[in-house]
């Protein structure tokens, strides 16, 4: 079926069910940013393939809301679908909730699958629409009823992460979380975030593309640990090891019946912004719900000593692979046909030559020319174009290794570039360098540093429509909270104090629709600096080890300090990566990291 046909089929079903508006978020049952094929309902009903967005379907209109990363892509993919694009955050554009409040009339019915909407959002919708006496239909998966060839739920084999990689045993992590439960006087801890469960139990999976997580729910008490998952995904030995730590595995969907039977008056700790509304609605009404951030969130974000050491090794391996790729690309772009897709395949080949490489940490973005202006462009067979010996190609890629997860962007010059391109290439690079060089007093959050990255662009009256940085997991999700770099304060997602061990991306960019796009990204590790009479000072350690392309830089735009920052970084890259290169690559890297 075409998107138009799917919309028509959904509207027929909505009429049968008495539903006036149907809400389709991107989420799975766990609030994941990226979802498995089974959960791609929003993609199915709209045709939009981006990782973020919400659809609303009514009898006479349909809308899609997405953020600035995807404005160009969404506009292109929605052509001819009758679906209207709402650019979230733009002046005059209503939010999904504002739209529903305006469009839904007295006593109408709003529908959604309660497993894909968080308890917090469901409560907000009920409060917002209560004055109109709006009813809610949340028990039916209407998309599932019309999606005849829907993929099955993923059931990939589970692996255990040895303590030499994790740095802390499962038993120690469990004990620490139970201590937190006791301090909060909680009887039950409900954990549904997939990366948090994987971190806590030192397990990894492959149930979401590029995200090494296991579809599961976890219920913890002071005596029990119940893991609800696909039992067949666990080898017998892993089951035995989990049971040795008190973890028993039950069928995935039985979690809903279990929470219904939680003892009367229990104090249940969970995060309403992450746990789905159907699960929370199944909890006995007389239970006391303690709505707090997951107890695992901060310990997961603060990498331990072993994880920090391993991440350094992962970034050396990744630096070797990406450096080899850039050398290969610049050497061969005029000699053979290289397309966006074939370049991505070649980079994967270089990464796969590294020991302990497990796969991409997200779908690679190899965007040439005008495609680079699409922030999260993803080449397909239909959009794939050849690279030429002119202009720039943006390569935003990453890998999973047993030693950790990487995420790097380099804008690579393939031939002549204009002064305009150099101007913005240099401004973005200055922002990257200035943020990474920050030294600060303990207690700062990511909000304190965003200006360092955006400043050179703001001086030009320019900006970019995405955050400057996100947290990165350890062999987990490449996007991990709560740390990040942004300038807007988000009340629902307060910026945490930056702690030693937090790993964050530093990725300013500039995008000119129809012309070019530039992004420079390194990962920086928060570290302690000296302690003085004024308190503890902190700094960032750059882990990414790949040269920035000197051919795109206008040194005259840079201060002496900024040039020194770049030269010092390039010296470290050369010293670190050279031992792993052949003679041709060494000679090339010597030139690529020369002083300016």
PLM ranges: what are they?
Residues 1-596:
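Active-site neighborhoods and metal-handling regions in enzymes and metal-associated proteins
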């Amino acid at each position: 079926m075409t998107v138009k046909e799917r919309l028509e089929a959904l509207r027929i079903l909505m009429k049968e069910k008495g539903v006036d508006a149907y809400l389709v978020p991107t989420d799975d049952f766990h609030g994941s940013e990226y979802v498995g094929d089974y959960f791609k309902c929003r993609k199915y009903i709209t045709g939009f393939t981006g990782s973020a967005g919400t659809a609303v379907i009514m009898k006479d209109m349909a809308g899609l809301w997405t953020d600035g990363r995807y404005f160009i892509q969404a506009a292109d993919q929605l052509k001819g679908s009758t679906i209207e694009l709402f650019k979230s955050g733009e002046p005059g554009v209503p939010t999904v909730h504002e739209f529903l409040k305006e469009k839904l009339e007295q006593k109408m019915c709003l529908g959604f699958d309660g497993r894909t909407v968080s308890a917090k959002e469901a409560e907000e919708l009920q409060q917002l629409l209560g004055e109109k006496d709006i009813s809610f239909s949340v028990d039916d998966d209407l998309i599932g009823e019309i999606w005849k060839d829907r993929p099955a739920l993923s059931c990939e084999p589970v692996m255990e992460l040895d303590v030499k990689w994790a740095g802390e045993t499962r038993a120690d992590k469990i004990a620490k979380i139970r201590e937190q439960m006791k301090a909060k006087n909680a009887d039950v801890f409900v954990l549904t975030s997939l990366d948090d469960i994987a971190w806590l139990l030192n397990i990894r999976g492959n149930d979401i593309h590029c995200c090494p997580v296991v579809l599961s729910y976890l219920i913890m008490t002071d005596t029990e640990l119940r893991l609800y998952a696909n039992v067949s995904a666990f080898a017998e030995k892993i089951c035995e090891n989990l049971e040795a730590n008190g973890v028993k595995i039950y069928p995935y969907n039985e979690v809903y019946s279990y929470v219904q039977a939680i003892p009367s008056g229990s104090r249940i700790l969970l995060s309403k912004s992450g746990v789905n509304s159907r699960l929370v609605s199944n909890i006995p009404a007389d239970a006391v719900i303690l709505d707090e951030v997951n107890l695992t969130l901060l310990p997961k974000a603060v990498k331990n000593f072993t994880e920090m050491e391993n991440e350094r090794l992962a970034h050396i391996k990744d630096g070797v692979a990406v450096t080899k790729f850039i050398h290969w690309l610049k050497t061969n772009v005029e000699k053979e046909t290289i397309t966006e897709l074939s370049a991505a395949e070649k980079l994967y080949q270089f990464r796969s030559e590294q020991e302990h490489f497990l796969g991409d940490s997200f779908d690679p973005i190899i965007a040439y020319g005008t495609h680079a202006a699409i922030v999260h462009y993803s080449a397909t067979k239909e959009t794939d174009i050849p690279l030429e010996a002119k202009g720039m190609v943006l390569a935003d890629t990453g890998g999973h290794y047993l030693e950790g997860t990487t995420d790097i962007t380099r804008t690579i010059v393939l031939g002549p570039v204009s002064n305009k391109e150099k101007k913005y290439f240099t401004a973005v690079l200055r922002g990257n360098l200035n943020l990474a060089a920050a030294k600060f007093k303990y207690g700062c959050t990511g909000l304190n540093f965003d200006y360092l990255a955006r400043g050179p662009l703001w001086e030009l009256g320019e900006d970019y429509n995405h955050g400057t940085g996100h947290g990165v997991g350890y062999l987990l999700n490449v996007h991990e909270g709560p740390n990040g770099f942004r300038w807007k304060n988000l009340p629902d997602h307060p910026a945490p104090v930056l702690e030693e061990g937090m790993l964050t991306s530093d990725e300013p960019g500039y995008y000119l629709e129809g012309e070019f796009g530039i992004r420079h990204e390194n990962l920086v590790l928060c570290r302690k600096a000296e302690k003085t009479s004024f308190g503890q000072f902190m700094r960032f350690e750059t882990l990414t080890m790949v040269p920035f392309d000197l051919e795109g830089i206008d040194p005259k735009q840079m201060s002496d300090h900024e040039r020194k920052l770049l030269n010092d970084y390039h010296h470290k890259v050369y010293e670190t990566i050279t031992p792993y290169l052949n003679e041709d690559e060494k000679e090339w890297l010597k030139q690529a990291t020369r002083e300016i």
